Amino acid sequence: MDRTEQKSIIEGLLFVSGDEGISPEQIAKVLEIEGNEVINILEEMQKECEGAHRGLQIVQYAKVYRFATKKEHASYYQKLIDIPTAASLSQAALETLAIVAYRQPITRTEMEEIRGVKTDKALQTLVSHLLIKEMGRAEGPGRPILYGTTKEFLDTFGLKTLDDLPPLSEENEQMNEADLFFGSLQEISK
């Protein structure tokens, strides 16, 4: 096995070991090479990561090596953490989101007729989470705002297009759309 392949395998081992890391001894056993050779390879890999424009570095903590992100990119990682997810949505917001997903473009009044309650707060939450947006205005008195889902909605729920939404069969149309939608999403993600 050549050095390039050894580095490739070590890189994979570092990845699968996650935050716990992996010791040079463990790597040596897997690759069936000497421990000091593993340390030499790890040091080479550390230098390669430092010199390259890469987002990861190899660090050593408490006799184990692991991948870590670079400190200079911390502000970007914080932005990702700050992006709200569907898990942080209330039941009312999830129900409203399911209605918008299946019935878009749809007005607030139409959503309230389906849900039987006001949707103002849920709509504000969904817009602030970038899951829905204003799609235009309906014809008719007052020209109410039409809502639809966004690209972020598709990304959040692992959908490529709206066509990937689980279909509503005639018998399921009587079910709560939120229950059907999120139950079907669980099936997709298995």
Swiss-Prot record:
Homodimer. Homodimerization may be required to stabilize the binding of ScpA to the Smc head domains. Component of a cohesin-like complex composed of ScpA, ScpB and the Smc homodimer, in which ScpA and ScpB bind to the head domain of Smc. The presence of the three proteins is required for the association of the complex with DNA. NCBIfam families: SMC-Scp complex subunit ScpB. GO terms for biological process: cell division; chromosome separation; DNA replication. Belongs to the ScpB family. Pfam families: SMC_ScpB. InterPro entries: ScpB_csome_segregation, WH-like_DNA-bd_sf, WH_DNA-bd_sf. The keyword Heme does not apply. The keyword Cell cycle applies. It comes from Bacillus cereus (strain AH187). This is Segregation and condensation protein B. Keywords: Cell cycle, Cell division, Chromosome partition, Cytoplasm. It is found in: Cytoplasm. GO terms for cellular component: cytoplasm. Participates in chromosomal partition during cell division. May act via the formation of a condensin-like complex containing Smc and ScpA that pull DNA away from mid-cell into both cell halves.
